[in-house]
Structure formats: structure tokens, C-alpha cells
Amino acid sequence: MKKLFFCLLIFASFSLNAQRLKLTNVVLVAQLDRSEDKFTAEINLAEIFAENGVNVLPSLNLLKQGASLSTLVSDSIKTILKEKQLDTYLLVNVRGYDRQFRLSSKIGSLTEELNIAHMFPLFRDEITSITFEFNFFRNDKLCHTELLKLKNVSTKEKLIQKLHKKLPRLIQRWKA
């Protein structure tokens, strides 16, 4: 009985945490190693967020090609974002290619996270599943994190298709 109560308490805290996000706008940053993967991810994710009523600005629109992601926390960029009323950063990265991954236990500040290198590409030929990690930051502090696991993704096209199918459900939860 104690275990059941404890599980319900944990579930309730996660659902309350998800409800507090109230996502209306986002600066989207795909933390991927290869530039073509970053472009593919940001364009597709921006499209999905826009279709679901979230004001989105991909980092590709703010940075010059090859620029460091840490530039996104510079004063000049923050001023531009404030003028556009964008207050939430969303860092998206590939956590891994199997179903065993958990949320990161140690997530630092926005500046620290932007400087971390992520080595996984968006897609590899031999994978069957992929896990994405979504980290939301407001005022340079982590305010929410969540994993999205996609199964049976044997091609890049299937991966994008499944992302278009599953992500809108999460976005609706994040908007609530």
C-alpha cells in the first residue's frame, strides 16, 4: 500500500510539473553534431510546434553558420529575444538508440548545457528506436525536462513521420 501511495505521489508531482510549463513561445536549439542533422531537426520541430500554436524561433535564424551555441546567451541575442517576447529555450538532443534511457540526472545551467557536445547523430542505419531529450529553460534555469521515445524507426523518413505523430501530444501537455 505504501508503494502504491508513493508511486501515485510521484506521478502526481510529474503531472503537476508538466502543467506548470504553460508553453507559449520557444527558442528551439537542436544539439546535434552534424549541421545537416541540426537543420533537419530544427526545421521539422519548428514546423510541429508552429502547427500546435506555439510561437517558435529556430536557433538557425539567430546564429551564423558554424557559430557556437553559447552565443545564444549573449546580451545582444537576449535583447532580440526579449523584443520578440521569447522567454523559453528548448534544447533538444538525442539521448540514445535503445529503450533504456532515463532523464539526465545532472543538468546544469543554460550556458553549461549549450557548451556540452552531443555526439549522437539524428539517425543511424542500424537503429530501431531513438530517445530524444527535451530540456526547457526559463531565466537560464531548467524548468522542465522530458524524454520522447520513438520505436520502429528503420529509416529517416519513418523517424520524421513518428515525430510528427507523437510530439503534438506532448506539446498540448506542455501548453496546459
Residue spans of the language-model regions?
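Short, hinge-like loop/turn segments at secondary-structure boundaries
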Residues: D75, G108-L110
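A solvent-exposed, charged loop/short amphipathic helix patch at secondary-structure junctions
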Residues: G53, L110-M119
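C-terminal/domain-edge helix-coil "capping" segments
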Residues: R20-L23, F101-R102, I116-A176
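Sec-dependent N-terminal signal peptides
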Residues: K3-F14
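Short, solvent-exposed beta-strand-terminating loops
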Residues: R95-G108
